[in-house]
């Protein structure tokens, strides 16, 4: 039984046990494009990946299943070398602590996503980045594009082009890196992890 066959079984919930860690060669491979129209197995895998993200952000389910919270997951992280990513970016409560009207600012499974253009300006998260496949803390600014335009297919096989900036742009670049065999710490300056250039936008 392949990794994908196991993951898409109706009874299976993706947990941290399914997520491979740094050192596994799948994380350093360039993943293969999925065939269109999508097969049922690839659609199911995307749904399972999104289910994992929702569970990871739900305190009750996360504790029950022992999950680390995540806003994105790429198929190579569950040992499936395909160009499939899921993103689930929650909206935060307002300054008074009221819950947001919409739970998520972005919720999508992207098949064969590709960055087709990007800003000249770079950006990095002030707190750095983490990864479900990396169990250690790696400090430093992960330098990425401040704005990106991404082409992708949804589970219906419809093609989309989306322009992203800020945190959502960072998230999609992190996940697209995964399908290209790149890990976030590859983008940290090894000699000066917190190096700031004049044009670098630091996002809180």
UniProtKB/Swiss-Prot annotation:
Q: Which reaction does it catalyse?
A: N-terminal N-formyl-L-methionyl-[peptide] + H2O = N-terminal L-methionyl-[peptide] + formate
Active site residues according to the UniProt entry: 175
Question: InterPro entries attached here?
Answer: Peptide_deformylase, Peptide_deformylase_sf
Under PANTHER family, the record lists: PEPTIDE DEFORMYLASE (PTHR10458), PEPTIDE DEFORMYLASE 2 (PTHR10458:SF8)
Function of the protein: Removes the formyl group from the N-terminal Met of newly synthesized proteins. Requires at least a dipeptide for an efficient rate of reaction. N-terminal L-methionine is a prerequisite for activity but the enzyme has broad specificity at other positions.
User: What name does this protein carry?
Assistant: Peptide deformylase
Enzyme class (EC, first level): hydrolase
Q: Which residues bind Fe cation?
A: 131, 174, 178
Task: List UniProt keywords, sorted A-Z.
Answer: Hydrolase, Iron, Metal-binding, Protein biosynthesis
- Organism (species): Streptococcus pyogenes serotype M49 (strain NZ131)
A GO biological-process term: translation
What does the note accompanying the cofactor annotation read? Binds 1 Fe(2+) ion.
What Enzyme Commission number does this protein have?
3.5.1.88
